[in-house]
A protein has these predicted regions:
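Conserved short beta-strand elements that form part of the metal-binding/catalytic scaffold
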Residues: 2-19, 55-97, 131-159, 248-254
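N-terminal interaction modules that seed assembly of large macromolecular complexes
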Residues: 22-57, 194-202, 207-208
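Vicinal oxygen chelate
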Residues: 31-40, 94-116, 204-205
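Helical scaffold of the NTase/Pol beta-like nucleotidyltransferase catalytic core
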Residues: 1-5, 163-188, 330
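Glycine-rich, aromatic-bearing surface loops/beta-hairpins
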Residues: 117-162, 286-299, 305-330
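Active-site nucleotide-donor binding segment shared across nucleotidyl transfer reactions
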Residues: 175-212
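Conserved catalytic core of two-metal-ion nucleotidyltransferases
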Residues: 70-78, 224-258
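Short amphipathic alpha-helices in soluble, non-transmembrane regions
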Residues: 47-56, 117-123, 214-223
């Protein structure tokens, strides 16, 4: 692990040197959720799997377009500046492609959308091919042989969804993300966090030009699904659509507001990082409170001993760096 940690530190320093040279600053409360380590052959892929098994937990190994990709979580995080990175993705090389062995990129979950990222870094060399994906699209900043990528869901949250086969199949099969793609759909809520209970629904946030358009949009795409209904929420300036697909309940929440800036997403981002910092013990506490009837944000507030309005407290925590969150959870 020590040799791997040294290599990771060197990689991260090289990336940040390139970012600094382009005046690209990452906010300290953004989540560097994983690193990607590429290998040059299938033989080396299997060799690294054996090495990783001695100091990391295998979260999942999947076949992606004909090649295996393994994801590991380290018991001890790789610390760099204010970030503590625990997850590493290990893809086997694509057949016929020459791959340089070593760390290649890291991925970031930010609290701003792709358009704002492009506006913030106007001189960056963006690759937008990953934006075509309906599920967890990504925007890349190319840095020569290295890169960073932005995506709305951390890799660990994606893996939690993939392991919940019925829910993952419903998300894919319903086409909800594809049909709402031009409205910045964000998948949030308890399923990606692994704290879902009986009755939990799949939560999706979208941005619409006006609320009347939202109702029209919902009827167009979802009126044929079971238990479809829409509801206006004046207190939130929002409209929701709820429906069932393959026995899985969905709720789509629409506001005239950038999806990334909506409170539902900011709460989700805070909770995702708190579970990253607090680990399995915090997750178990939250799940027990949820099963006892607490809603998600009050459950976090109770587990963390937060005073005041739980929703406001989580918005406050969302802006803290990981170092500050770790201090809070001591």
């Amino acid at each position: 692990m020590n040799e791997f940690n040294i290599a990771a530190q060197d990689f991260l320093q090289r990336v940040f040197n390139k970012l600094d040279a382009q005046n690209i600053q990452l906010d300290k409360h953004w989540f560097i959720d994983h690193l990607c380590y590429r290998v040059s052959s299938l033989e080396n892929y299997n060799s690294f799997k054996t090495r990783f098994a001695s100091f990391a937990e295998l979260l999942i190994e999947s076949d992606v377009n004909g090649r295996p990709i393994a994801t590991y979580k380290f018991a001890e995080p790789i610390r760099f500046r204010d970030w503590f990175i625990q997850v590493v993705e290990l893809p086997a090389p694509k057949p016929g492609k020459v791959t340089i062995e070593g760390f290649e990129h890291f991925e970031v979950v930010a609290d701003i959308g792709f358009d704002e990222i492009k506006t913030r870094y106007p001189k960056a060399a963006f690759s937008e091919s990953g934006l075509k994906k309906d599920f967890n699209p990504e925007l890349e900043i190319s840095l020569g042989e290295l890169a960073i990528k932005f995506h709305p869901l951390s890799l660990e949250s994606v893996i939690r969804l993939e392991k919940n086969e019925a829910v993952y199949a419903a998300v894919k099969g319903s086409g909800v993300l594809k049909s709402l793609k031009e409205h910045q759909p964000l998948l949030v809520g308890t399923f990606p966090l692994g704290i879902n209970v009986s009755g939990s629904d799949v939560d999706v946030l979208i941005n619409v030009p006006d609320l009347t358009a939202a109702e029209t949009l919902f009827k167009k795409h979802f009126s044929g699904f079971e238990n479809f209904k829409t509801e206006a929420h004046a207190q939130y300036s929002a409209v929701t659509a709820s429906f069932d697909f393959q026995g899985v309940p969905f709720e789509v929440f629409a506001q005239v507001k950038d999806s990334a800036k909506q409170s539902g997403n900011l709460h989700f981002l805070a909770e995702e990082r708190l579970l990253h910092v607090g680990g399995a013990s915090l997750g178990e506490k939250i799940l027990a409170l949820r099963k006892a009837g607490d809603k998600t944000e009050p459950a976090f507030a109770k587990a963390l001993g937060l005073s005041g309005n739980p929703y406001d407290e989580l918005l406050r925590l969302q802006k803290l760096s990981e170092s500050e969150l770790r201090q809070l959870l001591r």
